UniProtKB/Swiss-Prot annotation:
Coiled-coil region list: none
Protein name per the record: Ribosomal RNA large subunit methyltransferase H
Subunit-level organization: Homodimer.
UniProt lineage: Bacteria, Bacillati, Actinomycetota, Rubrobacteria, Rubrobacterales
SUPFAM superfamilies: alpha/beta knot (SSF75217)
A GO term for molecular function: rRNA (pseudouridine-N3-)-methyltransferase activity
Protein location: Cytoplasm
EC number: 2.1.1.177
CDD domains: RlmH-like
This protein's UniProt keywords: Cytoplasm, Methyltransferase, rRNA processing, S-adenosyl-L-methionine, Transferase
GO cellular component: cytoplasm
Pfam families membership: SPOUT_MTase
Length: 158
């Protein structure tokens, strides 16, 4: 299993999304440290789409841990995995390879700039549907928690 996770995301969560993330963070932190770094959303109205995306990219890239294996969440170019495959073929091998620190990068409403995608060691997708960035963060944490349970041979549902 991974030894440490960092989530670097555009935007601050509120309401139900913040509550959902806090629930899964509490569960995950029993197994390994998880840090969440939120960067400010760029003002698209003031900057325009392209410049706003570049500004967010700079903020994200500056906050990515240098020692981490970086996973970008991207609907268009990311690879899709089932829960078992995600646990056994992606997360478990990272720990064995010595790259136990994984940083997940999640864009805001504009997505991720090409330079962020290029920096990533790999890209994941949760499918063809477009998820709001807040929901993508909840889904990521839920899948990480599910992977922990799979790898430890523990029950997920009671």
């Amino acid at each position: 299993m991974i030894r440490r996770a960092t989530i670097v995301a555009v935007g601050r969560l509120r309401g139900w999304a913040a509550e959902g993330c806090e629930d899964y963070l509490r569960r995950l932190r029993r197994y390994f440290p998880v840090e969440v770094i939120e960067v400010a959303e760029a003002d698209m109205n003031r900057l325009g789409r392209g410049e706003a995306l570049r500004e967010e990219a700079g903020r994200l890239l500056r906050r990515l841990p240098a020692d981490a294996h970086v996973v970008a969440l991207d609907r268009k170019t990311g690879r899709r995995y089932g829960s078992e495959e995600l646990a056994r073929r992606r997360l478990e091998p990272l720990a064995v390879s010595g790259r136990g620190h994984v940083a997940f990068v999640i864009g805001g409403p504009l997505g991720l700039a090409p330079e962020v995608l290029e920096r990533a060691d790999e890209r994941w997708s949760f499918g063809e549907i477009t998820l709001p960035h807040a929901l993508a963060r909840v889904v990521l944490l839920e899948q990480l928690y599910r992977a922990v349970k799979i790898l430890r041979g523990e029950r997920y549902h009671w």
